[in-house]
């Protein structure tokens, strides 16, 4: 398919050839043309400019890896202002539940008060939530969990992590790729601390901020981590009070974090006092990714020395909303 885009930039010629290739008519305003893995064909990315300008009556949807789109190709112009962006996130718990048990999902969505749930629903929702925390929201892993294929969940998540490691090498210089890998692999250790604050010494003994700032920025821009900065004063606007030198980082997905930390699924299924120490980190990661997936900017936290801390603070209009996360009963 990419050869078609390499040989011409004329949208009508491209559509005609794609129609021949697929043996399907591509009709204006009636056919949705989907170009998957578009990051592998930079010529197709550039062609979107001409689709927008010359044939806006054709509807085209492109899907691609943020890594490939952000870092993959030099010398090709991105059609700025010619495409609408939709950022995709890991599957949320509600989306997972809808596919796992539609009737339970309908009950879950009908909950509109903070009243205790009937035991029968509480138990079923707890089981579903445990399953979600094990698999996380990466679509292939979540589907394996819905199919009750626990081994498939583990294989899928490990394959994704392996693919990320290969992407580090593919899309960065050798020195930067090495530093990216060090930061990424330090994530479980960073979150194992009580205050979760990022410490460069956990990346590598003797590490300094100026050596690893680019690696952190790379991971953030690639969508693999979230960076949550300290806000000294919880007042609007939060950005005016943030301390960029003090921050926490979280994984894009709680399932990936679990596997990156080498925690087996059984950790969720047994009452292990050792695991309780890490439960808080996983709970915070879950809340963060859920808020982000629902359009909430969650890039600040508040702390008052060693006395008190609120895991996340969110600016909503002229108000600051505190989000405190508890992983157990309190």
Model-derived regions: residue spans:
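Active-site ExK catalytic segment of metal-dependent nucleases
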Residues: 318-329
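Interdomain motor-coupling "hinge/lid" segment immediately C-terminal to the ATP-binding subdomain
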Residues: 73-192
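Short glycine-rich substrate-engagement loop in P-loop NTPases that contacts/grips substrate
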Residues: 2-29
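Conserved catalytic/switch belt of AAA+ P-loop NTPases
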Residues: 45-68
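Conserved ATPase-coupling elements of RecA-like P-loop NTPase cores
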Residues: 3-7, 38-48, 72-73
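Conserved P-loop NTPase "ATPase switch" module shared by AAA+ and STAND
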Residues: 26-44
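Accessory nucleic acid-recognition modules appended to NTPase machines
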Residues: 142-319
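Structural recognition of the conserved hydrophobic beta-strand(s) that form the central parallel beta-sheet
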Residues: 34, 59-65, 87, 96
């Amino acid at each position: 398919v990419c050869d078609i885009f390499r040989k011409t930039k004329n949208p009508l010629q491209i559509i005609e050839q794609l129609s021949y290739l697929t043996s399907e008519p591509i009709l204006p305003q009636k056919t949705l043309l989907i170009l998957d893995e578009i990051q592998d064909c930079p010529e197709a990315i550039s062609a979107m400019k001409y689709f927008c300008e010359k044939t806006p009556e054709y509807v085209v949807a492109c899907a691609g890896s943020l890594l490939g789109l952000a870092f993959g190709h030099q010398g090709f112009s991105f059609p700025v202002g010619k495409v609408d962006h939709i950022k995709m996130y890991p599957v949320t718990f509600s989306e997972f539940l809808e596919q796992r048990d539609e009737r339970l999902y309908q009950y879950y969505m009908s909950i509109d008060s903070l009243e205790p749930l009937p035991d029968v629903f509480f138990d079923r929702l707890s089981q579903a939530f445990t399953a979600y925390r094990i698999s996380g929201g990466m679509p292939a892993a979540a589907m394996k969990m819905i199919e009750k294929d626990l081994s498939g969940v583990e294989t899928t998540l490990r394959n994704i992590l392996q693919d990320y490691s290969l992407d580090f090498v593919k899309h960065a210089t050798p020195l930067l790729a090495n530093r990216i890998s060090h930061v990424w692999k330090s994530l479980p250790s960073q979150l194992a601390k009580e205050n979760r604050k990022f410490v460069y010494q956990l990346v590598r003994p003797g590490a300094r901020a100026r050596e690893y700032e680019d690696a952190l920025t790379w991971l953030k821009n690639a969508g693999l981590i979230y960076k949550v900065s300290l806000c000294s004063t919880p007042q609007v606007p939060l950005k005016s009070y943030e301390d960029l030198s003090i921050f926490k980082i979280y994984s894009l997905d709680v399932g990936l974090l679990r596997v990156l930390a080498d925690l087996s699924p059984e950790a969720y299924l047994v009452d292990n006092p050792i695991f309780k120490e890490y439960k808080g980190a996983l709970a915070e990661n879950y809340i963060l990714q859920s808020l982000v997936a629902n359009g909430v900017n969650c890039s600040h936290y508040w702390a008052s020395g060693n006395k008190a801390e609120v895991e996340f603070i969110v600016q909503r209009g002229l108000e600051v909303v505190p989000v405190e996360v508890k992983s157990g009963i309190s």
